[in-house]
C-alpha cells in the first residue's frame, strides 16, 4: 500500500518537532518546506539520521519550492512569524496574512485534495484566510487551537487534583486568544463534572477561576519564559492528533477551529468548537447547549475573531467576508 504523504509548510520549531513526531508514529512520508534555503533540508536530514536509532521507516525530504508538496494527503501550516514577549497573537496579523496568501496559492496548485491544518497565529483569522486563498472545501481546512488549549486546561486540572491526566476530559470553545472559553461545566474527572468536585471539597471556585485564566494565558506564559519564541512541543502534539484522526479515520471528537455554517448562530467564520474528524475531514460539528454566561463569553470571543477577519479583508481586498 502506498504510504501517505504529509507536507509541513514552515520548518521552524513547530515544523521540526512535527516532522520528528510524525516520523516516530510512521504516519507517512514527510516533506519539510520552508522559504529559508537549507533549513528544511537540514532538519529533514537530521531527523532521518535518527530513524535507525528510533526504528522508523519513512522518507524525509526538505524543499524550498511548492512543487514538493504535490499530492500531499495532509498539510500542516506553521509558516509565519512567531510571537515574542510583549506581543499578542493579533500583532502578527499583517505579516502572516501575506504568508497565508502565498501558502494558499501553493496548496491550491499542488495539493487541492489535502486535509489542511493551520497553526499560524492569529489562528482563527489565519485559517479563515487560508481557506479562502486555497479554495479548498471548508471541511478540509481546520485550525489547531482547541486541542492545545484543552490540553493545557486538562494539565492544570491534573496538577490541581494530583491525579492522572488520562482521567480528565475538558475542552475550550471560541477563538484562540485571550477571550477563549474554557468550559468548566463540561469538564470532568472520570465522568464527575468539575462543579460537583467543588461541592465535594476537592477544590474551590477561586482555584478553578485561576486555572481558567492560566489556560487563557497559557501561550503567553511560555512566550515570557522562552523569551525568544513561542510554544512548539504541545502545539505539534495537538496537530499530530488531528492529522492522525484524519489519516486513520478514527472519527475522534476534538475541539478545533472549524468553519461554521449556522451552528451556534454563526456563518462563514472559523471558531473553536468540538467536531468529529475522520476521513472526510470535519464530518460533524457538535453544537452543545450553553447557559447564559457561557453564551455571553462565547459571543465575546466570536466578536474578537470577527474583528480580526474584518482587518484581514481590509488588508487583502480579494478576501470576501
Curated annotation (Swiss-Prot):
Enzyme class: oxidoreductase
Catalytic machinery residues: 176
Keywords: NAD, Oxidoreductase, Tricarboxylic acid cycle
InterPro entries the UniProt entry points to: L-lactate/malate_DH, Lactate/malate_DH_C, Lactate/malate_DH_N, Lactate_DH/Glyco_Ohase_4_C, Malate_DH_type3, NAD(P)-bd_dom_sf
Alphabetical GO biological process terms: lactate metabolic process; tricarboxylic acid cycle
CDD domains assigned: LDH-like_MDH
Superkingdom field: Bacteria
Residues the record lists as binding substrate: 83, 89, 121, 152
GO molecular function: L-lactate dehydrogenase activity; L-malate dehydrogenase (NAD+) activity
Binding annotation for NAD(+): 10-15, 34, 96, 119-121
Catalytic activity: (S)-malate + NAD(+) = oxaloacetate + NADH + H(+)
EC number(s) stated in the UniProt entry for this protein: 1.1.1.37
Function of the molecule: Catalyzes the reversible oxidation of malate to oxaloacetate.
Family, similarity comment: Belongs to the LDH/MDH superfamily. MDH type 3 family.
HAMAP family: Malate_dehydrog_3 (MF_00487)
Protein name: Malate dehydrogenase
Organism: Bartonella bacilliformis (strain ATCC 35685 / KC583 / Herrer 020/F12,63)
Gene behind this protein: mdh
Amino acid at each position: 500500500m502506498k504510504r501517505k504523504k504529509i507536507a509541513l509548510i514552515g520548518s521552524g520549531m513547530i515544523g521540526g518537532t512535527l516532522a520528528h513526531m510524525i516520523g516516530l508514529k510512521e504516519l507517512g512520508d514527510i516533506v519539510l518546506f520552508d522559504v529559508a534555503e537549507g533549513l528544511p533540508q537540514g532538519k529533514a536530514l537530521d531527523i532521518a539520521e535518527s530513524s535507525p536509532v528510533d526504528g522508523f521507516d519513512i522518507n524525509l525530504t526538505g524543499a524550498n519550492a511548492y512543487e514538493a508538496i504535490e499530492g500531499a494527503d495532509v498539510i500542516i501550516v506553521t509558516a509565519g512569524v512567531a510571537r515574542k514577549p510583549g506581543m499578542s497573537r493579533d500583532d502578527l496579523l499583517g505579516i502572516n496574512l501575506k504568508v497565508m496568501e502565498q501558502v494558499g496559492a501553493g496548496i491550491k496548485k499542488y495539493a487541492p485534495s489535502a486535509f489542511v491544518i493551520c497553526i499560524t497565529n492569529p489562528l482563527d483569522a489565519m485559517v479563515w484566510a487560508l481557506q479562502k486563498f486555497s479554495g479548498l472545501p471548508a471541511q478540509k481546512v481546520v485550525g489547531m487551537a482547541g486541542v492545545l488549549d484543552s490540553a493545557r486546561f486538562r494539565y492544570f486540572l491534573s496538577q490541581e487534583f494530583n491525579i492522572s491526566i488520562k482521567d480528565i476530559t475538558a475542552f475550550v470553545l471560541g477563538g484562540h486568544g485571550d477571550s477563549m472559553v474554557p468550559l468548566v461545566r463540561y469538564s470532568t474527572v472520570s465522568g464527575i463534572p468539575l462543579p460537583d468536585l467543588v461541592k465535594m471539597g476537592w477544590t474551590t471556585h477561586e482555584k478553578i477561576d485561576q486555572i481558567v485564566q492560566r489556560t487563557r494565558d497559557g501561550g503567553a506564559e511560555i512566550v515570557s519564559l522562552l523569551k525568544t519564541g513561542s510554544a512548539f512541543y504541545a502545539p505539534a502534539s495537538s496537530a499530530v492528533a488531528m492529522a492522525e484522526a484524519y489519516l486513520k479515520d478514527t472519527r475522534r471528537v476534538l475541539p478545533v477551529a472549524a468553519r461554521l455554517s449556522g451552528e451556534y448562530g454563526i456563518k462563514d467564520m472559523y471558531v473553536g468548537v468540538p467536531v468529529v474528524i475522520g476521513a472526510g475531514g470535519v464530518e460533524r460539528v457538535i453544537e452543545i447547549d450553553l447557559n447564559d454566561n457561557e453564551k455571553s463569553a462565547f459571543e465575546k470571543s466570536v466578536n474578537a475573531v470577527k474583528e480580526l477577519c474584518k482587518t484581514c479583508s481590509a488588508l487583502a481586498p480579494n478576501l470576501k467576508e
